[in-house]
Structures are given as structure tokens and as C-alpha cells.
Regions:
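Short hinge/gating elements
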Residues: 44-49, 60-65, 176-189, 248-257, ...
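Flexible, glycine/threonine-enriched loop-and-boundary segments that flank and lead into catalytic domains
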Residues: 202-222, 323-325, 342, 350, ...
Length: 506
């Protein structure tokens, strides 16, 4: 994989420190259509996002798009989120500390690629300082705290923070080539160059005064021009008093210009001081970056831990603000939701006037539910609500309900809305049939299937026939491929309600 990336990206892949193997069976499958229909990003993400770091926000998106199918992992997330939920003071103090932590993952990637700037390094130092405070805060949790156990290995970066503090100015320029980065006292050679650059006028004045005393020539002057550089100018009346080490440089009508080995050396230092300063600072900066890069694995580990803490604290904040509850996750086939609410619609209504709903699918209840009702009755909202609550539960989040018990779902399939694909030459009906066929061919007994108005893209009776056939196929188990798949089917075809007379699962 790394070789492939190196060949295709045409750049260094040094920032990739490890590749984690992902077992697909441990994650819920959400296809593009389901993600779009449920509007996970940005709508659900917007409701749950109380993260304080860029890393946490990025991880929250990843978790919402890949819910878990591992009960132990889900319960671990619930337990840590529960600690934040139960302690408002801990939640607020952690949020304050997290707010001062920068995007360490991206900074470390730039460091690995040697594409970072001085402000990245200062941002890293500030992050290290906040991590230390956050670590102290979490260490104050009870001894058996899972949160304390998890974050205890995040690492102490006091040494790196102190090194950066000694080396880099608090408000450095953006470009590493501009100089003005390294603090005074960090490097002796650089201090000498800086002293030359900053104190050259004072040094030249002292040299002029010393040469006046040594030669006894009061009119002796040290001057500069771009052609000849620095020189000592003496009038012709005083030529007899010049010291032996003076070397003639130029003859004028009324004066002679000289230089000394000392002045020549200092001239070179003064004229090259700015260039040398920038070069030295660049070398010292690169050396500092390499020192930080040597700790990249520890820093990446800490960054990941910070992101996880941020997301779990965000779950707790959402649960406290919106009155969510911790769902029970089981290996069964039930979805039992008492007084469930659509998280996004409820949020947009400012929590006023939303009618909650109970849901009982599987686990002794019917596996297939057919919803009928007039337009604007809330059918689409309800079926999306069930899917979102299931998804949130398997993400490790609390859910909008009074009580919830969710049997693991390996996939969520949706067929919602009407749209065509003109670029592919597909009509609205064609798109609808392709998506429905995809569901019927790929769903499993542990899937959750959401179907809204299947058959709407054609004539009434043809649509009714299609809807009837789809439900019948699901109820018959599709040749056992999806026997027991939990299904919500919203429709205007009231004729479908007779199916409960034929099938016990409706």
C-alpha cells in the first residue's frame, strides 16, 4: 500500500507511520444513498457536534459514517461518554482545555513532510501545554474511571514543550526563510551573528574612536559606500600619522581611504550577517523539527486520544442538552424505542411541539411494518427517525428517546425520495428500481431497510404491483437471504394493509 501511494502521489509518504487493518464485520455498512437520504453529514453531525478540536470534529464525522457492530466497543464508548454526562464540571473543564489544542494530526503530517512553518511549532507547544492540564484534570477522576485508564497513556510532552519554548519566539513569522524565529540564548553562534547585525553601528563607532586615539588623528572617519564597502578616510594633511597596518584602498583629491584586517573581517561579517542569520535560523529550525519528528508516534497517539475524548464529551454534551438516553445494545433482532424523536427535526423545531413515537420491530413483534397516511402526516420523518436512532446507538451516542433497546444492525438501506440521473440516462423510475434492487440483493437478516413510497415513479396500478412484490419478497425471506430483515415501508397504497392477513410478520 505504501509503495502504491509513493508511486501515485509522487511525493513523500513519511507522515504515514502505521496502517491499521479494518475488519468490515466490525462496522455497519452505509452506502452513499443511505448517507444522503438520512442526511448524516451535515444535519445529524450538526446536531451532535459539540467538539472543540478539529481532530474531534473530523473523528465525529468518521464515526457517524461508520457505526460499530461490536457491542463491547459500543459499550466502551457509552461508558466514557457516561462519565462526562454524569459530571458537568468535568465536561466544562475538559471543553476549556480542548479548546486550546490545535490540529496536531495535520501539524505532524506537515512536520513529517518538512512542510511546516514556525507557527505550527508554536501551535504544537500550546497543544502540549493544554494536554498536560487536561491530563491532570482527568487524573483527578475516581481511581476506577475508564476515562482515566484510557487517557493515562496519552504521554507527557513537557520536554518537547520546554525545548520549543527555549528555541522559538512566541510570535514568529509565518515563513521559515524570513528569519526572526529563534530566541536569543538558544544558540551561541546565532547570538553572535545577531549581535553583529544589530550592533554593527555601535561597533563601528567604537572602532572609529579607538583608531582616532591610536593614530592621534581626530578627523579620522569610518565610512561606507556600496562600491568600496567600509573604509577609514584620512585627510592628506594627516597622512604622516597613519599606523603601519593601514592598507590603502582609494586615493581622492583631498583624502586617502584605507582599511585594516580587522575592519575587513568585520565588513564581511556585517554584510553577510543578515544572510548568515537566516541560514543559521533555518538550520536550527530544521534540526528542531527533526527532534519533534522523532517523537511522532507518541504525538499521533496523543492526538488520537484527544480526538476520542473530544467526541465522547460531545456526545455527553448533546445528551445533556437534548435529553437523550443511553440505549441498550443487544445481539437480538429487536428495535424497541419508547417516545423516540427525530434528532434533526426536533432540533430545528427548538424542541417544541415534536410528537414522539414508539417503535417495536422484531424481538417478538413484526419484522415488517407498513405505514400509511396522508401527505405531511410524518411518515418519512418517522422512518428516518428509526434509522437515525439506530445509527446513533451503534456510534456510541445517547439517543433521543425515553428508553431504547437496539439489536445490532449490520447495514442500513434506504430508498427515499425521487430523483433522476440524466447524465447516466436514468429516469426517476429507473433510479428507483435500481436502488430497490440493490437493497433486495444485498440486505441480510440483520439489516434495517427503510423504503419510502416505492412504486411512485410509474402508474398507480403498476406502482402498487411493484410495492406489493417488494414487500412480499422481503416477507418471504428472499430465498433466506434477508429473512428477518427489519423493514419500515411507508406508502400511500392502502391496499397493502391487507398483507397482515397473509403474513404474520407484518
Amino acid at each position: 500500500i505504501v509503495k502504491y501511494l509513493y508511486e501515485t502521489q509522487k511525493s513523500s509518504v513519511a507522515h504515514i507511520k502505521r496502517i491499521n487493518m479494518r475488519m468490515e464485520s466490525n462496522f455497519m455498512h452505509l452506502d452513499v444513498q443511505s448517507r444522503s437520504s438520512l442526511d448524516i453529514i451535515p444535519s445529524l453531525y450538526g446536531v451532535l457536534n459539540f467538539t472543540k478540536t478539529t481532530m474531534g470534529a473530523r473523528l465525529l464525522k468518521a464515526w457517524l459514517e461508520s457505526p460499530l457492530c461490536d457491542i463491547a466497543a459500543i459499550e466502551w464508548r457509552q461508558e466514557l461518554a457516561g462519565e462526562f454526562f454524569a459530571d458537568l464540571n468535568l465536561r466544562r473543564q475538559c471543553a476549556e482545555r480542548l479548546g486550546g489544542i490545535y490540529d496536531m494530526e495535520r501539524i505532524m503530517s506537515r512536520i513529517a513532510l518538512k512542510n511546516c512553518n514556525p507557527r505550527d511549532i508554536i501551535a504544537l507547544k500550546k497543544s502540549f501545554d493544554e494536554i498536560k492540564k487536561l491530563s491532570s484534570l482527568i487524573e483527578s477522576c475516581r481511581a476506577d474511571s475508564r476515562l482515566r485508564e484510557f487517557f493515562g497513556g496519552a504521554g507527557d510532552f513537557s520536554g518537547l514543550s520546554e525545548l520549543i519554548g527555549r528555541a522559538v519566539k512566541d510570535d514568529p513569522p509565518l515563513s521559515v526563510r524570513d528569519g526572526g524565529i529563534i530566541k536569543e540564548g538558544y544558540d551561541e553562534e546565532l547570538d553572535g551573528v545577531n549581535k553583529i547585525a544589530h550592533n554593527s553601528k555601535e561597533w563601528l563607532l567604537n572602532l572609529e574612536q579607538n583608531e582616532q586615539k591610536r593614530s592621534g588623528i581626530k578627523s579620522l572617519k569610518i565610512k561606507y559606500n556600496r562600491v568600496f564597502g567600509y573604509y577609514i578616510e584620512i585627510t592628506k594633511a594627516n597622512l604622516g600619522a597613519i599606523p603601519e597596518n593601514y592598507i590603502r584602498k582609494q586615493t581622492l583629491a583631498n583624502a586617502e581611504r584605507f582599511y585594516t584586517p580587522e575592519l575587513k573581517e568585520m565588513e564581511s561579517q556585517i554584510l553577510n550577517a543578515d544572510e548568515r542569520q537566516k541560514k543559521l535560523e533555518y538550520e536550527l529550525f530544521i534540526k528542531l523539527v527533526e527532534e519533534i519528528a522523532a517523537h511522532s508516534e507518541r504525538i499521533y497517539h496523543a492526538a488520537r486520544a484527544i480526538a476520542v475524548i473530544d467526541v465522547l464529551a460531545s456526545f455527553a454534551e448533546a445528551a445533556a442538552k437534548y435529553d437523550y438516553v443511553k440505549p441498550e445494545i443487544t445481539c437480538g433482532d429487536e428495535i424497541e424505542i419508547f417516545e423516540g424523536r427525530h434528532p434533526v427535526v426536533e432540533n430545528r423545531m427548538n424542541y417544541m411541539g415534536f410528537i414522539n413515537n414508539d417503535t417495536m420491530i422484531g424481538g417478538g413483534h413484526s419484522h415488517v411494518q407498513i405505514l400509511t397516511g396522508p401527505n405531511m402526516a410524518g411518515k418519512s420523518t418517522y422512518i428516518r427517525q428509526v434509522a437515525l436512532i439506530t445509527l446513533m446507538a451503534q456510534t456510541g451516542s445517547y439517543v433521543p428517546a425515553r428508553k431504547a433497546k437496539i439489536g445490532l444492525c449490520d447495514r442500513i438501506f434506504t430508498r427515499i425520495g425521487a430523483s433522476d440521473n440524466l447524465a447516466a440516462g436514468q429516469s426517476t423510475f429507473m433510479v428507483e428500481m435500481i436502488e430497490t434492487a440493490n437493497i433486495l440483493n444485498n440486505a441480510t437478516p440483520r439489516s434495517l431497510i427503510i423504503l419510502d413510497e416505492v412504486g411512485r415513479g410509474t402508474s398507480t396500478y403498476d406502482g402498487l404491483a411493484i410495492a406489493y412484490a417488494v414487500i412480499e419478497f422481503i416477507l418471504s425471506g428472499g430465498g433466506k437471504l434477508l429473512d428477518g430483515a427489519r423493514t419500515l415501508f411507508a406508502t400511500h397504497y392502502h391496499e397493502l394493509t391487507v398483507l397482515d392477513k397473509t403474513f404474520s410478520k407484518v
